[in-house]
Amino acid sequence: MKLSRDYFKRSARARLLTAVLSGALVGFSLPPWGWWPLAIIGVAIFFALCNLTEKNREQFALGALFAITWLSLGMMWMWWLTAPGYIIVVLLFSTLHGSAAIVANKIGSTSISRPIAHCLAEVIRFSLPFGGVPLATLPIAISPTRLASTATLGGPILTTWFVLQLAALFTAYFSRRETRSGVLKIAVVLLVIHLVATNVSPVKNTGESLRIAIVQGGGPQGVLAINATARDAVDRHLMVTQTLQLQDNLDAVLWPENVIDVVDFKKSREYSEIVDEAKRLNAEFVVGITEDAGSQRFTNAQVVVQPNGEISSRYDKVRRVPFG
């Protein structure tokens, strides 16, 4: 069996199976694997498959299958948090990409419309429901690369479009669906955006550096709060923190969100312990706390504790959304 373009054009089954494969490639571009080039390759293959059919039902199936494997891999950790939620979220967001595939096939040049349509699907995912679920995204996949510099111009939305458009460029070039001049125009636009983002970015290198210890306390995974005490997480993080030494010359020590769960942080045992560690290491501590805020209410905050005990900065989360 020869896997030629004609074969995929004739075989709907081959297209659907390959859509699953292309989504898996995008999934493996995300942490913990982090093979970022697979994001561009996977999207390019998916776009090429969509170009081989005009049927709305199949366009939807291709988009949904592509997104199901992408998101099911990228958000796999949710299974241990809430298995029903994991299944619902993957299926819900996959329908967005199924719908985007249909819309893109009906509007103008697909080399332009597909990246825009699927970017809009991601915009909806970033926004709804409950303030959005921006997990397993294309910007996360390319974050270790210079391509991520586009985020300084247009945030994750521009970066999402950039990755999708770059993939569409390769699809257009190799499928010869687009004229050579059309491919060149797309390439020039992407190059200009990348150069501007890299060289005219509002984010500047100060030339200074900070030495920061990031503490992850460890412990068994998948333990629900109802099956543990709030103190368990604190003890584990203190144990790891105590392996740090003054000779490490730290500027700051960072603890994760929600490690400390107390009624009033400033009056708590945990505050005193953090101050003691800050004095010992002569470094400020940036710690995540959950603190009571009246009857049946609480707040999530990140606070900065100085070696002298001063809380020099505090940020309270403005809006809670699922998973952060």
Task: Please provide the spans of the model-predicted regions.
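Membrane-embedded alpha-helical bundles of multi-pass enzymes
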Residues: 2-200
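Generic, ordered loop/turn and secondary-structure boundary motif
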Residues: 36-41, 136-139, 152-154, 261-264, ...
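Soluble catalytic regions of membrane-associated enzymes that act on cell-envelope
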Residues: 198-323
